[in-house]
């Protein structure tokens, strides 16, 4: 689906929402497409979202629901966003905007693309380099505008291995996901371990 949209290697893609499986599907899909995940905190106000979208120069964003869509629509015209993909359509039945699509429809575009471009997905995934930027994690912006920390696949892997060396997990461990996926620590303990 990301390749069908036209995501280029190392292109930034914004993700906005509470922790849920779709966040992870998008996050890992973006990385497999050699893109860069730019998480946005679900508590962000429209002006903060606008700043992050413009700073990241994202053309594509995924978001959770009507609440987040309302915030994005308030600033969408002031960003480079071409397509907004909504995971949860509840409350949006009958909603129509050419810039907005729903997650299921977006995935169907990917199925069609994979059928007409055999091997393209695997080729892109295999082209990922350790020094490629995997994520941009934005600071909270308490001392000014948020700053984007660019994290490579290699640095994430090294940090995850270092954490596991001092706190090895077991197969029967259960993890409570309490920080937003836009936060690096939640990724390190919930996603990458």
Language model region names:
Residues 101-104, 111-138, 145, 168-174:
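Conserved pre-ATP/AMP-binding loop-to-beta segment of ANL
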Residues 59, 77-87, 175-176:
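Conserved helix-loop-beta element of the AMP-binding
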Residues 130, 149-170, 175-178, 188:
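Conserved structural elements of the adenylate-forming
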Residues 29-35, 186-193:
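Conserved short alpha-helical elements in the N-terminal third of ANL/AMP-binding
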Residues 66-81:
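Adenylate-forming
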Residues 1-47:
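Conserved AMP-binding/adenylate-forming
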Residues 34, 141-142:
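Conserved G/P- and acidic residue-centered "switch" motifs that form tight phosphate/ATP-binding loops
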């Amino acid at each position: 689906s990301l390749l069908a949209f036209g995501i280029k290697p190392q292109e930034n893609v914004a993700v906005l929402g509470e922790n849920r499986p779709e966040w992870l599907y998008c996050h890992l899909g973006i990385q497999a497409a050699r893109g860069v995940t730019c998480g946005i905190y679900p508590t962000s106000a429209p002006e903060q979202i606008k700043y992050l979208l413009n700073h990241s120069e994202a053309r594509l964003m995924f978001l959770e629901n009507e609440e987040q869509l309302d915030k994005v629509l308030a600033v969408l015209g002031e960003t480079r966003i071409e397509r907004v993909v909504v995971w949860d359509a509840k409350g949006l039945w009958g909603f129509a905007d050419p810039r907005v699509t729903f997650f299921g429809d977006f995935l169907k575009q990917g199925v069609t693309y994979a059928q007409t471009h055999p091997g393209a997905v695997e080729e892109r995934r295999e082209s990922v380099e350790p020094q490629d930027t995997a994520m941009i994690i934005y600071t909270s912006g308490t001392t000014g505008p948020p700053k984007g920390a660019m994290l490579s696949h290699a640095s994430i892997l090294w940090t995850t291995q270092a954490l596991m060396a001092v706190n090895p997990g077991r197969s029967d461990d259960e993890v409570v996901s309490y920080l937003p996926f836009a936060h690096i620590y939640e990724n390190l303990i919930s996603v990458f371990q």
